[in-house]
């Protein structure tokens, strides 16, 4: 579905002479040979969006933390509901979370800037932390006394069940997120966005928890339009010999 939507968008962008596509995805891990399906799908979407004439900038971001964020809501719900957290191996994976304000400013600088055309850009905070670190900092900022410790094994199925049950999040959202968090996702790219503010992870989490910040409403649907009844598919076909046709 992601590939088909990306292909439709790419076609529409070319048809409408769109000047620039900015696609926000996630940082890709260094161990590309064992990449999760979720992260591989993001990379494939990048390629499909860039398969035509419209310039594309793929913004690969660390965990974006801000008020109302879906990923951070999982963290706050776990801290709220679990006085004891036995954290599996994937919670020790390294990441560089980025403040929502910094992510938005990055996108603002990138849009329409030819220096970033057809280049992947990685953005993240200056601090390298683990998911367990984020849980602990969040617990302190929420003033919740929590016993958070690691266990030396990784059970993907149990992790999905545990996080989904106690975070109140849909399994379709939790499952790919857990799969991708087994990777270390730190910045690799040398192409950076300059002159950005830098907030500590503590400052970022504290602001994300601020209930006085008004969160913009998100549209729940679009007006129905009558489209032509066309059928199209995007196929994954391996090309081991790297031929062009």
Where on the chain are the PLM-derived regions?
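NAD(P)-cofactor binding segment of oxidoreductase domains
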Residues: 1-21, 36-51
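Substrate-positioning beta->alpha
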Residues: 5, 70-71, 90-112, 118-119
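Structural signature of the Rossmann-like NAD(P)-dependent dehydrogenase/reductase core
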Residues: 20-23, 57-60, 96, 122
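Conserved beta-loop-beta element that borders a ligand/cofactor-binding pocket
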Residues: 25, 47-68, 74-77, 81, ...
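Conserved catalytic-site region of short-chain dehydrogenase/reductase
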Residues: 27-39, 63-69
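Short, surface-exposed alpha-helical segments at coil->helix boundaries
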Residues: 39, 43-46, 72-73, 132, ...
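Short aromatic/basic micro-patch
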Residues: 58, 94-97, 128, 198
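Mid/C-terminal beta-alpha module of Rossmann-like enzyme folds, strongest
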Residues: 106-173, 184-245
């Amino acid at each position: 579905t992601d590939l088909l939507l990306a292909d439709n968008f790419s076609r529409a962008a070319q048809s409408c002479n769109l000047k620039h596509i900015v696609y926000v995805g996630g940082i890709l891990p260094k161990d590309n040979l064992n990449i999760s399906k979720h992260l591989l799908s993001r990379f494939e979407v990048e390629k499909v969006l860039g398969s035509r004439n419209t310039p594309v900038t793929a913004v690969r971001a660390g965990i974006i933390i801000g008020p109302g964020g879906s990923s951070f809501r999982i963290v706050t719900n776990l801290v709220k509901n679990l006085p004891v957290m036995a954290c599996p191996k994937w919670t020790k994976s390294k990441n560089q979370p980025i403040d929502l304000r910094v992510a938005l400013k990055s996108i603002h600088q990138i849009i329409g800037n030819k220096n970033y055309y057809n280049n992947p850009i990685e953005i993240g905070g200056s601090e390298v932390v683990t998911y367990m670190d984020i849980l602990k900092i969040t617990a302190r900022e929420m003033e919740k006394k929590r016993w958070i410790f690691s266990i030396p094994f990784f059970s993907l199925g149990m992790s999905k069940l545990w996080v989904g049950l106690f975070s109140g999040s849909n399994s379709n959202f939790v499952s790919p997120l857990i799969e991708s968090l087994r990777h270390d996702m730190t910045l690799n790219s040398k192409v950076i966005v300059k002159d950005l503010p830098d907030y500590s992870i503590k400052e970022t989490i504290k602001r994300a928890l601020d209930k006085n910040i008004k969160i913009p409403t998100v549209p729940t649907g679009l007006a129905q339009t009558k489209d032509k009844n066309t059928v199209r598919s995007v196929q994954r076909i391996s090309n081991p010999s790297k031929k062009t046709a």
